[in-house]
Amino acid sequence: MKKILIALLVCFSFVTANAKDYSKYYQNLPVQMQQPTLPSIPDNHVSILECGGNGDGLTMNTQAFAKAISKLNKMGGGHLNVPAGIYLTGLISLKDNIDLHLEKNAIIVLSEDKNDHFKIDKTTGKKESRATPAINASKRKNISITGEGTIDGNGEWWRPVKRSKVSDVEWKEFQAMGGTLNEKGDIWYPFNLKYEPNVAENMDAQEKTRTHMIRFTSCENVLVQGVTLLNSPKFHIIPTRCKNVIIDGITVKCPWNAQNGDAIDISSCKDVLIVNNVIDAGDDGICMKGGAGAAGVAAGPCENINIQDNTVYHAHGGFVIGSEFSGGMKNIVVRNNTFQGTDTGLRFKSAVKRGGTSENIYIDHIYMTDIKDAAITFETTYFDNHVGAQKQTTPVKQEFLPNFQDIHMSNIYVRGCKTGIEAHGAEGMVHDITIKNSNIFYTKEAKNIDAACKILLENVRFESFAK
């Protein structure tokens, strides 16, 4: 009897993180999917305050977070509780079976000093060449970020700014921080700032060190729930080569002109659920990536991705595939999502050396208003227009071509877009696409589809203002 009681206590000491029932999202799907496994977190609790943390907005908490994670790790895992306050920090590296829990009014602010965001190479003893994502995990199992608090990426200390994307007042405010202008004087770089040191020898080299806010690599059983993510230096969250990922009920917000300010990017992951999120981003809203070229093929596809009940306000695209997806896209369901004020709604973008093949993509019941450009767009010559980029003029080897196929859209409702459907590509790049039972109200043109693009429209109604 005693042994049975001990066994029961051990079982109950592990709690499935915020054990919400997600089964309703897996009913009546057009493809078979496995519901992601939630992380199992031991019922141990450590407060950041117990480990020297201080939420006064002045104290650096990097060591306190590391100490708390180490303490929980020795206990087999548990919940790292962050109470109300402002916690300045550098890197937070999660370990197995740990939940980073932000209580209401808890704000984690990433340090303005870029040096706080680099790991030291254990072999050379020198700083790594690129900053590490502020909250990171690699090859971990059962990890989560939960709660009602906020993570502020302090992105303006990292991101370059294009003059064309800010007002006169904003431009003066950036220059008041110090910084450096490019030769043309139309791009501001956060290099040679008044109050923070450089981390590279010039502005271009420093720009290459910029990285994401949250990145999980090769992890299993991941949950991000409830928190608010603000103003990342680059992408806000990007699980990469992960399995069993749930992103539920988070808010992502950054300036509309934030360079590379993607909200949620999923890269070569399997069994993913993205639900109930609210996004207002500087770049893509919910984006699927699968690597470029041979590296993308090795990483594998995005597979079994379920995206429902999300709202996207500003973004370059509400739902996006690409630009790099050489590993492929397989079994993706996007339904019951709203896009209001995005540049494009459903965006499929890629190019030579970045492309792959899509399979079993189903998009249903999408509601869009005030779309700046095309409601639905296919681009196969996409140019990654990062700051200072120049289009390549030399011939490119014709490999890893985009193959957008087997994409099925239905019940797409659009009130306000410049172009309804736009598709450009050579023969074989955009084909076997169906759009059914949809209404599109446009202001410029209903369709702009190349003859080589094979898109079947069934019961699609286009309307515009009377002329």
Model-based region annotation:
Residues 104-105, 141-149, 220-230, 243-255, ...:
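Right-handed parallel beta-helix
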Residues 1-81, 86-99, 103-218, 223-225, ...:
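Extracellular "leader-to-stem" segments immediately downstream of a signal peptide or signal-anchor
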Residues 82-89, 263-265, 351-352:
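Conserved short loop/turn motifs at secondary-structure junctions
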Residues 54-56, 293-297, 327-328, 354:
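Short, small-residue-enriched loops and turns at beta-alpha junctions
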Residues 86, 241-243, 251, 270, ...:
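Active-site-proximal loop/turn and secondary-structure-junction residues that shape catalytic pockets
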Residues 325, 336, 345-467:
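Extracellular beta-rich repeat passengers
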Residues 77, 91, 111-112, 154-158, ...:
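Short glycine/acidic-rich loop motifs that flank beta-strands on beta-rich extracellular proteins
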